[in-house]
Amino acid sequence: MDKEVSELVVLQLIHTLISNKNEELVRNGGGINMIGNNLRISLVKLTNEIQNNLLINELTNLRRQSNVANGNRKLGINDILTIVKNLFPEYRTTLNDGQLSLHGLEMHDIEKLLDEKYDRFKKTQVEQIRMMEDEILKNGIKTGASQLQPHANAGKSGSAGTSATITTTTPHMAHSMDPKREKLLKLYRDTVLNKLESKTGNFQKLFKSPDGSIIKNEINYEDIKNETPGSVHELQLILQKSITDGVMRKVIGTDDWKLARQVQFELDDTVQFMRRALE
């Protein structure tokens, strides 16, 4: 994992484990997890949490699939010790009988550092996303060595000696595909939409209050319903972007925001259903 991500993971789990332990001690009538003014945590438990956490493993696997340098290795005990010392250079850390002690460190120090590092990481990621959006708007979406451009391959259908192909334009890009493949993708699209809309009907409600000042290039529901996606994955991407737009469009906690979050769960269920059906 990247240095920033590794620090956030270790810091968050330290905070979580100490908080959980303190709550347990308080419930049992004891004090907080400290000796004098020193916070304590089991290094073995911290390492196991990091190495076996489902979300962390998913992040590591995604970075491995993306061939991210130094992003596909799990953190070991020595890595964690180094990170802890780098996180708290002004505090002495000792290791005795598997217990990692943070001398003079208090919970509010951990919380303050966690907030600072999260805010810094978030700002960096937002800026990178903004740069990527500008690049995509300027140059289009690149896939492999080729770059997909609107209306590409138009006019190639009906070539002599080859089966007819159809150029199908979606709101995002053009596709040249075999009619049989197009028919299957249309069937898949209709099945997914019917399954998604049969749950609560909330999906269509996401498109009733567009806001171009917040979301660039919002997707139109009729385009999703009538255009043929280039692949199963592209349809999922389009649906996911529609929901993400709905989440980003509204203030956290509002009814519309909650609706978009609910649709996210419905999409996840629908995707799992379709995967099982295809298998």
Curated annotation (Swiss-Prot):
The protein's superkingdom reads Eukaryota
Set out the biological process GO terms recorded for this chain's protein. DNA repair; DNA replication-dependent chromatin assembly; DNA-templated transcription; nucleosome disassembly; positive regulation of transcription elongation by RNA polymerase II
The record's section on InterPro entries has: EAF5
A cellular-component GO term for this protein = nucleosome disassembly/reassembly complex
Q: Where do the record's region annotations for Disordered lie?
A: 147-179
Question: Where does the UniProt annotation place the signal sequence?
Answer: none
**Where in the cell?**
Nucleus
Q: Where is the composition biased (Low complexity)?
A: 154-170
Assigned keywords, A-Z:
Chromatin regulator, DNA damage, DNA repair, Nucleus, Transcription, Transcription regulation
Assembly with partners or alone: Component of the NuA4 histone acetyltransferase complex composed of at least ACT1, ARP4, YAF9, VID21, SWC4, EAF3, EAF5, EAF6, EAF7, EPL1, ESA1, TRA1 and YNG2.
- UniProt record similarity statement: Belongs to the EAF5 family.
Known role: Component of the NuA4 histone acetyltransferase complex which is involved in transcriptional activation of selected genes principally by acetylation of nucleosomal histone H4 and H2A. The NuA4 complex is also involved in DNA repair.
Additional facts recorded:
Present with 937 molecules/cell in log phase SD medium.
Name used for this protein in its record: Chromatin modification-related protein EAF5
